[in-house]
């Protein structure tokens, strides 16, 4: 990749990816990811099990419970929402990362396969994510989970969902989370900050239309309004749990992640901001063995261990 930007040498081989341009291409990609993930998860058995939970509209949401060896109960838990521009199923590396969080932070991971746009626009997927948190609380005894040590987390679109869930948990149900793990989160659907234009040509999503992604997620033009929790930077962030916010230097979402971190700080929230020097969006998924990814994973796990206590 030729670029005047000082992208980390270990990330310069990352190629540009194009989101599927129509429903048939999207369906084909989803089927491929499902098949690859099914094969990939086999190596994790019996540490990963599948179940379903009921969302607010009675939809059955698949979730994966990752329980590391010798985990003591009651254990802390991370409820995790994967990225994928609100339209894509998780990548195999999402499960690899989730397994590392479970093993190295000594926690249960509840990995949520929420509903995706465009078939299911907001708030379907968001409600699925919130239902997973409520389910973890309601089934804590069976799961062996300590309800006082719950963290929500996610990357990219999943970071948006985690931030929105954290807001809703406190504002509507006074659920006191232990933390928020927000990895290059998409927290501002207006998408007008300088990094969007500055890094639009940087892989992996070279030339991606952030407005199109946002409107696909919403199911209508941005001009028609943005519902509560869909764009977390517009929400009330006071009294929220401590947050880890990760913003790669050359990510088009960099500025909104930093702005969200500052909003949290301004409201008195404990924030650990990790601006990944030389990083690009999704670097940990696309270059998992790079030193950049290893350093970021270490920071995330250290944050989890700290807030779990």
Predicted regions and their residues:
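Short strand-loop-helix active-site module centered on a catalytic nucleophile
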Residues: 63, 79, 101, 122-189, ...
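Serine-hydrolase catalytic core
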Residues: 222-277
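Catalytic active-site module of serine/aspartate enzymes centered on a nucleophile-bearing elbow/loop
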Residues: 290-309
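Short beta-strand element of the alpha/beta-hydrolase
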Residues: 74-83
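Hydrolase active-site cap/lid region
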Residues: 167-225, 239
